[in-house]
Amino acid sequence: MGETEIEKVSDTTFVLQMGPHHPATHGVLKLLCEFEGERVINIKPDVGYLHRGVEKLSESKTYPGAMTLTDRLDYISSMTNNIGYCLAVERLMGIEPPPRAKFIRTMVSEMTRLSSHLLWLATHALDIGAMTVFLYAFREREQILQFFEKICGARLTVSYPRIGGVRVDIKEHVLDEIYKFMDLMLIRVDEYETLLTENRIWIARTRGVGVIAPEDAVLLGLTGPALRGSGVYYDIRKQIPYDAYSEIDFEVPLGEKGDTYDRYLCRIREMRQSVLIVKQCIEKMPEGKILSDKSPDIDLPHQAKRKIEPGDSLWNGFIAFSEEKQEIMPKGEIYSAIEAPKGELGFYIVSDGSGRPYRMRVRAPSFIHISAIPKLCEGHLLADVIAIIGTLDIVMGEADR
């Protein structure tokens, strides 16, 4: 079947297949849209085209080695994926990162949020027809990716956080450059709003479109801007603070009507808050270590089955994660979640005491939000479906896993 193939199911309704290679689905998402006339009466999402078995693959990886798999969930926000996974393992192992590492992780988390929201704004605006914003947003996102490159040498799949801290420290001149860029970023966000927020066409395409009531948003499991756009105050950075968020002052933007326009405004306002958080992290960042003394080293080669001696490992001579079936991790299970750019990203890990996860389950916000598409699109036109999908900010890498 092609990108858009029409199947007649009765004299009054027809089914239009959208995707899995349609540019507006932002990935390999297929939607079977049933119409009566020009109005949507039902949508059936069809996922799985990007399934790579991340959760099963993690069972054959060591805890540090599974980091590269988390990079490739929401590949737009690899930094927050890494941090979410590290926090889960740290809580399981009882490791506390040093204060400087916490501030660094909070700072790069918010830079990732900015990068993610910029890409969302660019593609969402392009879907609706605002070409200029697409170009402007990519200009700023490129700056943020260049900062990531200066910090750790990678732009997209960074693998920068570590269990117990971060991989390398950030040089002072890089922190100064980031601080100056944040001042510029506030001006840029004002420019985006000048082009869109009061634009008559933008308002006509987004206001009153894809409305979801607060109680329905909660029942569907929406999180992040998709939930806060309906006026529900839920932000893990506030409710269950992690890293340095408890020491940072910021507000949580909320919508009122729960439509596409409110979800747009929430993300725009979040970008301003992220700028303020980054600046506070730089101002308050303490000196000191960036990695806990209890942090595990990366795995030995697979053929190695010996105990690591003192001096061989960053883990002070403890038995690191080798292929020997020895109890080197606490047995048990844990669920740990963070506020990723798209919503609640959670990791459920079961430990059997070995150096590898017995089971890892990822709670990806994009997968949950796809399930809300039928509810949001019911009664709307096909053009509105494009706007609604864009406002949910779906990435299929984490949805299919």
Curated annotation (Swiss-Prot):
Gene Ontology terms: cellular component: plasma membrane
Membrane topology annotation: Peripheral membrane protein
UniProt cross-references to Pfam families, sorted A to Z: Complex1_49kDa (PF00346)
Any one GO MF annotation of this record: NAD binding
Subunit structure: NDH-1 is composed of 14 different subunits. Subunits NuoB, C, D, E, F, and G constitute the peripheral sector of the complex.
Family label: Belongs to the complex I 49 kDa subunit family.
Listed name of the protein: NADH-quinone oxidoreductase subunit D 2
Native organism taxonomy: Bacteria, Pseudomonadati, Nitrospirota, Thermodesulfovibrionia, Thermodesulfovibrionales
